[in-house]
Amino acid sequence: MQVSVRDNNVDQALRALKKKLQREGVFREMKLKQHFEKPSEKKAREKAEAIRRARKLARKKAQREGLL
């Protein structure tokens, strides 16, 4: 990953780098890789995430259609 530093503004470059890493999911992946996750736990986590995403999508769709 590459970030350009303009006008010796390192703070701004660091913020841009953090934002890029966050978007790519690097921090989340690092957190998950810190400890071994059993396959059954991984499956349960992924299923819960999918349910969460579906609920969020349904909520947004209902709000767009004016139901909420």
Curated annotation (Swiss-Prot):
Pfam families given in the database record: Ribosomal_S21
GO BP term, example: translation
Gene Ontology MF terms: structural constituent of ribosome
Keyword Ribonucleoprotein: yes
Assigned GO CC terms: ribonucleoprotein complex; ribosome
Key words of the record: Ribonucleoprotein, Ribosomal protein
Signal peptide residue numbers: none
Keyword Thylakoid applies: no
InterPro entries, per the entry: Ribosomal_bS21 (IPR001911), Ribosomal_bS21_CS (IPR018278), Ribosomal_bS21_sf (IPR038380)
Annotated Gene3D superfamilies: Ribosomal protein S8
Classification via PANTHER family: MITOCHONDRIAL 28S RIBOSOMAL PROTEIN S21, SMALL RIBOSOMAL SUBUNIT PROTEIN BS21M
Similarity field: Belongs to the bacterial ribosomal protein bS21 family.
Protein name, UniProt field: Small ribosomal subunit protein bS21
Organism: Ruegeria sp. (strain TM1040)
